[in-house]
């Protein structure tokens, strides 16, 4: 439901749209939220699935918040098909570790050690992944997928400062859009005309 507006927009632009639920979201199975660690591998598999349906497809990835970080992590996966031509990330975090560190400090005034280290141990045991492996910053350095980075300058959940190292590190062609007055995940609402003009123009360069 949250992505219905986005899916409708892309459909109106002539794209065929696939909107999968991430693990433990919507109708997808699972009881652990992966923060993009496992989900990014699912995106790779969905991309391969699209190519089985249409071997000539050109694919664009789009995500918001955790979905944005998932897109970035997928973009750095060596198994990602070359048919993925472009990606758009909106307010994604540099890594799950960085995001939880920020939240611990912002909400409780606590350092990451020992609370986050303890939480990470539980995550490894119960969910099977390390929070440090959910690392979008490392991923964008690895593969040259063109990427549009979007962030609101009033984001106090995933701080705006996270977008700058992501943008700087990205190995491929890239653009950065900072939306004035937009909170977390609210850039589309804050300035929809400018938002969609930027997204559509960027995608059209590669698809």
Q: What name fits each language-model region?
A:
Residues 182-196:
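Catalytic histidine-centered segment of alpha/beta-hydrolase-like enzymes
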Residues 7-29:
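Conserved alpha/beta-hydrolase
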Residues 136, 145, 159-168:
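Short alpha-helix in the alpha/beta-hydrolase fold that links the catalytic acid
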Residues 142-144, 149-151, 155:
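Short beta-strand/loop motif that positions the catalytic acidic residue
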Residues 32-54:
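Alpha/beta-hydrolase active-site loop
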Residues 53-65:
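Alpha/beta-hydrolase fold nucleophile elbow
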Residues 73-129:
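Hydrolase active-site cap/lid region
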Residues 153-158, 185-186:
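Acidic catalytic loop of the alpha/beta-hydrolase fold
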